[in-house]
Amino acid sequence: FGKDMKIVYTPLHGTGEMLARRALAQAGFDSVQVVEAQATADPDFSTVKSPNPESQAAFALAEELGRQVGADVLVATDPDADRVGVEVLQKDGSYLNLSGNQIGAIMAKYILEAHKNAGTLPENAALCKSIVSTDLVTKIAESYGATMFNVLTGFKFIAEKIQEFEEKHNHTYMMGFEESFGYLIKPF
């Protein structure tokens, strides 16, 4: 599917371009267009009111390019590239801005399903989410026999869980997220 999917990416004048291009290429996505007007670092963020991937307004130039190239998915990262926003093409030609909870649920389902299909889903699989994030992901995790750990807001608490899993060897970390558009799919 990756070879057929058309993606538009914008770093919103931040540092994410090189990282995002590499990550998308490694994931098998061959058709990635970058919003050139937002590809270089600009401390004034001159083409966007707020460089926040949670905001649909931040996707204006990505949506414009997306319509031009027929993109299926639009991706934006905030200036320091630690939050990722996504919009998906709708049947009517518009783009739907996904919430952090929706992105987290899609990622959890995909990761768990891919591991299940490959026969690599550990019996002690664990996911982490902040306490303010959706419980839908808990239900997704449970449907695969995985355990969900709810932690306080802040990735340092997800990191503490990962460290605990590694020290105790009691769970295998699969992914973690916060509804504020932060995701971590592999231990660091």
Residue ranges and their predicted role:
Residues 1-188:
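Phosphate-binding chemistry for phosphorylated carbohydrates and sugar-nucleotides
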